[in-house]
Amino acid sequence: MSNVVPTPVFPLFAQPFATRLERALQHLRIGRPVILMDDFDRENEADLIVAADKLTVPVMAQLIRDGSGIVCLCLPGETLDRLELPPMVDSNRSRYSTAFTVSIEAREGVTTGVSAVDRVTTIRAAIAPGARSGDVVSPGHVFPLRAQPGGVLTRRGHTEGSVDLAALAGLRPAGVLCELMNADGTMMRGASLERYAAKEGLVALAIDELAAHLQARGATGAPAELAVAA
């Protein structure tokens, strides 16, 4: 018997995956956020993701306002190694092995680091071509996450999904995410997620269908392959 959890069937997922994927990639290319859901038997959370290349202050404000406030920058290992960002802990015992590094702030151009403007400044400093360890300091108010090699074909997490989608869109393999939350502090799911997506005009994808799409095309998760796998 298959252990694959089916993609949820409700209006957010009513359109065929190929249609939603193309819309999602178009949105990412112009700096609009996309909803990415993981499996029901995993975190069962909806994250708002945006391509780091296209991040703007208004979208960052939306992530902070409508999400948990923990804004994460998802990057391949080679980028984090160039920035010399070590893991947050020596032994990762979190339930889903979420690979946080130490938190960061831009060395220049920020005040307290908390505002939407400051967090965008930090992310731009971290993903700039040729960025090095001296361009960011720790601790800070942006939380980098190390995406596993192979992307969602290796680990079915929002971290890997956001990096894979950015690469599929032809952008730098770097994503920014924040978990969506309701006003009462509960995670946004079901009807509340439907209402939010309709109000904001957002497209939704599920990690299981993204993984199936990449596997069907023989992609290995390498950014160069993903750029032509859409």
Swiss-Prot record:
User: Top-level EC class, please?
Assistant: lyase
Q: Which residues bind Mg(2+) 2?
A: E43, H158
Which parts of the sequence are marked as the site Essential for catalytic activity? H141, E179
* Requisite cofactors: Mg(2+); Mn(2+)
Q: Name one GO cellular component term.
A: cytosol
Any Pfam family matching the protein: DHBP_synthase
Q: Name one GO molecular function term.
A: magnesium ion binding
One biological process term in Gene Ontology: riboflavin biosynthetic process
Query: Which residues of this UniProt protein bind D-ribulose 5-phosphate?
Result: R42, E43, D47, R155, R156, G157, H158, T159, E179
Chain positions recorded as Mg(2+) 1 binding sites: E43
| Xref: Gene3D superfamilies | DHBP synthase
- Pathway where this protein functions: Cofactor biosynthesis; riboflavin biosynthesis; 2-hydroxy-3-oxobutyl phosphate from D-ribulose 5-phosphate: step 1/1
E.C. designation(s)? 4.1.99.12
Q: How many cofactor units bind, and how?
A: Binds 2 divalent metal cations per subunit. Magnesium or manganese.
Quickly give the catalysed reaction: D-ribulose 5-phosphate = (2S)-2-hydroxy-3-oxobutyl phosphate + formate + H(+)
The entry's keywords: Lyase, Magnesium, Manganese, Metal-binding, Riboflavin biosynthesis
So what does this one do? Catalyzes the conversion of D-ribulose 5-phosphate to formate and 3,4-dihydroxy-2-butanone 4-phosphate.
What the record says about family reads:
Belongs to the DHBP synthase family.
Q: How does it assemble?
A: Homodimer.
Name the UniProt record assigns to this protein: 3,4-dihydroxy-2-butanone 4-phosphate synthase
